[in-house]
Amino acid sequence: MAVTFSDLHTADGLKALEAHLAGKTYISGDGITKDDVKVFAAVPLKPSAEFPNAARWYDTVAAAVSSRFPGQASGVSASSAPAAAAPAASKDEDDDDDMDLFGDETEEDKKAAAEREAAKPAKKKESGKSSVLMDIKPWDDETDMKKLEEAVRSVQMEGLTWGASKLMPVGYGIKKLQIMLTIIDDLASTPIEEVLCEAPINEYVQSCDIVAFNKI
């Protein structure tokens, strides 16, 4: 049987609520329902100590609403003429409500969320980068190191960027080329050291070694 509360801004209205809550925690059922939320919205202030059952119920619903919506209030105020609480909805009517403060998402909510996700442009996956330091050694002390470096830098691969370089002494008048490079992992499919040891670059390059390798 539906229960109707009216004039909950008055003492007479609160007396009816107090009597209804005698021996009860909630308006209907063993847990908080939309009935509690609707009645709570019609009670402008926490009932005084004159209405202990109503005051206890008010605190219980207020705590549940606060936990459901934990965001900090920003000082908004609102006022309206007092109105009677709406009759408690039947179970069938509850099922038709658009919003359930204490229930799960409706099928419409889930469908709308899925459509929003599908409408978002797919984010391009960012490829990882690696910083590499290489030692490139010539055949002998007669190798033209300028041409060796030109041959090395002539290698162009997708995802490969050459960086700074310098000549380092090895011994017996031989110098090696130490050079930095950056590679985009998903694009540089062939190991650079293999390319540097192939013709025509191997006319100048005797061997190459990776000295340092770091993910960026």
Curated annotation (Swiss-Prot):
UniProt keyword Oxidoreductase, yes or no: no
GO MF assignments: guanyl-nucleotide exchange factor activity; translation elongation factor activity
Keywords from the UniProt entry: Elongation factor, Protein biosynthesis
Bias (Low complexity) ranges: 73-89
GO CC annotation: cytosol; eukaryotic translation elongation factor 1 complex
Pfam family, one: EF1_GNE
Region called Disordered, residue ranges: 71-131
Family: Belongs to the EF-1-beta/EF-1-delta family.
Record-linked PANTHER family: EF-HAND AND COILED-COIL DOMAIN-CONTAINING FAMILY MEMBER, ELONGATION FACTOR 1-BETA 1
Protein name: Elongation factor 1-beta
